[in-house]
Amino acid sequence: MAIKHYKPTTNGRRNMTSLDYKHNLSGDKPTKSLLRILKNSAGRNNQGKITVRHHGGRVKRFYRLVDFKRNKDNIPAVVKTIEYDPNRSANICLLAYADGEKRYIIAPKGIKVGQKVVSGEGADIIVGNSLPLSNIPEGTFIHNIEMQPGGGAKLARSAGTSAQILGKDDNGKYVVVKLKSGETRRILARCRATVGMVGNEEYSLVNVGKAGINRHRGIRPTVRGSVMNPVDHPHGGGEGKQPVGRKSPLTPWGKIALGVKTRKTKKSSNKLILRRRKDAK
């Protein structure tokens, strides 16, 4: 997908870029039966308290029901449209199954309108087909990877991402997969994945250009703690510019901000990680 550049008519437009969807999407309107109303909580919980900062004020949008399970086995489907999805970085494509049902899936790189895809153990190794990891050969690039059999895809769903199958255990229970982050981990061989990479890989190259675009996306400004008042942040207060005044930087809630590990030490999935992403760099 091509990157569109703008003439510097204003300071905000000067470095702005966007994706040229005109020549890459089919231009169809979304299927109404697969749309749901998406409420914007603006980072508040049921008590109205802020639980996630810097959220709120985005444009209204509908949620597209995306099929992450791909459990409609051995029924061929045809790609009808490739559409924009405002809720994710990847595009989505509409599948029309032979029995009349329609479902959205994440659009893989290189998929075309009119292409046939299928799910199931006997599916061919073709971009867009979904099958268990045990049936996919080593070296294949995959996306939409399940963590638990039948639980739906959790890994490699963003634009341009993929993972690679490195090998399989001797007993055939686990498959070794290398993720985009560099982490190498074992995943149950009964879990499903989709062949190929996620499309729209140039999404990360887009320069929003101005703060107003982020406001449309629901991203509010991030204010430094050192310019707040003492009642709002441990770094706040003082006459003019002041240092932190503590042994180490703190979060707004008074906990140490830097150098503290945030992953649970007794997490059950630790034994499945063969190489941490931080060790891979």
Swiss-Prot record:
Function recorded in the entry: One of the primary rRNA binding proteins. Required for association of the 30S and 50S subunits to form the 70S ribosome, for tRNA binding and peptide bond formation. It has been suggested to have peptidyltransferase activity; this is somewhat controversial. Makes several contacts with the 16S rRNA in the 70S ribosome.
Subunit (UniProt): Part of the 50S ribosomal subunit. Forms a bridge to the 30S subunit in the 70S ribosome.
GO cellular component term of the entry, any: large ribosomal subunit
Cysteine pairings via disulfide bonds: none
SUPFAM superfamilies found in the cross-reference section: Nucleic acid-binding proteins, Translation proteins SH3-like domain
Biological processes annotated in GO: cytoplasmic translation
Gene field: rplB
Cited NCBIfam families: rplB_bact
Compositionally skewed regions (Basic residues) per UniProt: 261-281
PROSITE patterns, alphabetized: RIBOSOMAL_L2
Chain segments annotated as coiled-coil in the UniProt record: none
Pfam families with a match to the protein in the record: Ribosomal_L2, Ribosomal_L2_C
Family: Belongs to the universal ribosomal protein uL2 family.
MF terms in GO: rRNA binding; structural constituent of ribosome; transferase activity
Protein name: Large ribosomal subunit protein uL2
Region (Disordered): 223-281
Entry keywords, A to Z: Ribonucleoprotein, Ribosomal protein, RNA-binding, rRNA-binding
Organism: Mycoplasmopsis synoviae (strain 53) (Mycoplasma synoviae)
